Amino acid sequence: MKGKLLKGVLSLGVGLGALYSGTSAQAEASTNQNDTLKVMTHNVYMLSTNLYPNWGQTERADLIGAADYIKNQDVVILNEVFDNSASDRLLGNLKKEYPNQTAVLGRSSGSEWDKTLGNYSSSTPEDGGVAIVSKWPIAEKIQYVFAKGCGPDNLSNKGFVYTKIKKNDRFVHVIGTHLQAEDSMCGKTSPASVRTNQLKEIQDFIKNKNIPNNEYVLIGGDMNVNKINAENNNDSEYASMFKTLNASVPSYTGHTATWDATTNSIAKYNFPDSPAEYLDYIIASKDHANPSYIENKVLQPKSPQWTVTSWFQKYTYNDYSDDYPVEATISMK
């Protein structure tokens, strides 16, 4: 959500058929599980409880960990796992289903990473809030912190997590990220220009990694790039995202937005009059193995009701997060 994290002191926080080189959007995904990869991305809205103590982070960590929607994936990318205690609890709750996990981006630069690259700083107030969990072994884990952000994003180690995952007899490379937020506090700096530079950093990393061109490379997360009303505009930021990453446009199914105040109780409380946005994606690099089909499906799972108290008033919600999860089905050749 544009500027959604500005409700307190700190903000931590593209069809274009010609760009899609896969088969028809109506193609059926392979029924061979070894040839199908299921990847989910979900921004779980776990802001620091030091700043936002009343968003049920600990309770939602348990609800998400037990939820059906997050099960039966190969890989899950988590965004906004900022709060240390709640994110540790969520990762612990997911351990049985997804025993192979990265640490949270930018929280430390220790031996939990094979490499730390980019502009990491241990003195930055907030981490990058991205982690990847996997059913399959993770052969390599790299964290990369972007060169710069704007506005309050400068106060976090935002960047991306790279994983090399071995599913049976093949390697798949999954990058999880959370790009610059749309933020009025960026001043004269355009958040869109910052996002473009961050996408270039991801693309440069992929090129320099020399990944074999017969292996799949997937990029996913909260891109903060809005698909709505942009799909048929070749000059839009949405179109530019795919061009910069040289990535295939997926088939889109499910709900028409990943953030929607008309259907989501948390989003409605925060920004009741804001238009819906489609910000979260999982896409495939065209410089590497090209999926025969890739679908992004927006799910709308409802959580059991949970209640918080603020200033002696109770507030009840029935969503896991203010963002909806996106489930990608990738048919590999």
Curated annotation (Swiss-Prot):
Catalytic activity field: a sphingomyelin + H2O = phosphocholine + an N-acylsphing-4-enine + H(+)
Gene Ontology BP terms: killing of cells of another organism
Disulfide pairings: 150-186
Top-level lineage group: Bacteria
Cofactor: Mg(2+)
Keyword Disulfide bond: yes
UniProt main location, coarse: secreted
Listed GO MF terms: sphingomyelin phosphodiesterase activity
Enzymatic class: hydrolase
Keywords from the UniProt entry: Cytolysis, Disulfide bond, Hemolysis, Hydrolase, Secreted, Signal
Activity control, per UniProt: Activated by cobalt and manganese ions.
Subcellular location: Secreted
EC number of this enzyme: 3.1.4.12
Signal sequence, renumbered to the chain: 1-27
InterPro entries documented for this protein: Endo/exonu/phosph_ase_sf, Endo/exonuclease/phosphatase, Sph/SMPD2-like, Sphingomyelinase/PLipase_C
Record family assignment: Belongs to the neutral sphingomyelinase family.
Function: Required, with sphingomyelinase, to effect target cell lysis (hemolysis).
Name of the molecule in the record: Sphingomyelinase C
Gene: sph
